[in-house]
């Protein structure tokens, strides 16, 4: 069961598609968000969640104070789950009289990134299916530059794959392993 861990929508249960996604575990999400909060990154953030799955990363950010979250998901069933979860979190935030802008984009990441950016995002989550290659992630990161302004980029990968060679314009700030998962912290 995936849930919002903390913030104004904390403890709300999110829906998940049957097998189309691999949601980030609560333990890893809590670690990611503790670090983001300690760096004062979340409050008022403009968040982009690529390969969104259930939308849990973006919606956790919304619960903790992000002003805007866009979730990009190619799979139609998973995108529908993102929409349902967005409604759950938006309703909870509305009860608290918090204004929040959320959007689900049902496109492939490469198609989304090929369109001109209308927003400068300052917090990006990239948690692709493990079968996505490092070359594809590097291509995504190259295209993503047009959408970023003083951004923190969090990339989740299988610990069984080599670390990507980060493209120009990105600095690897840190990496941390959690069993089968490794989280990379980039600044752009």
Which residues fall in each region the model found?
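Class I S-adenosyl-L-methionine-dependent methyltransferase catalytic core
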Residues: 1-188
């Amino acid at each position: 069961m995936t849930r919002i861990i903390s913030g104004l929508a904390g403890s709300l249960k999110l829906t998940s598609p049957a097998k189309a996604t691999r949601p980030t575990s609560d333990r890893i999400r809590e670690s990611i968000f503790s670090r983001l909060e300690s760096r004062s990154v979340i409050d008022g953030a403009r968040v982009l969640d690529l390969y969104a799955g259930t939308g849990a990363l973006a919606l956790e950010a919304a619960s903790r104070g992000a002003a805007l979250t866009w979730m990009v998901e190619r799979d139609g069933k998973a995108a529908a789950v993102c929409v349902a979860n967005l409604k759950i979190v938006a309703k909870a935030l509305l009860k608290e009289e918090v204004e929040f802008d959320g959007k689900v984009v049902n496109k492939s990441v490469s198609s989304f990134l090929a369109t001109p950016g209308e927003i400068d995002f300052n917090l990006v989550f990239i948690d692709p299916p493990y079968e996505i290659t490092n070359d594809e992630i590097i291509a995504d990161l190259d295209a993503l530059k047009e959408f970023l302004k003083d951004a923190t980029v969090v990339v989740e990968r299988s610990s069984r794959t080599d670390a990507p060679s980060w493209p120009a314009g990105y600095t690897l700030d840190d990496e941390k392993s959690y069993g089968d998962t490794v989280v990379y912290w980039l600044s752009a």
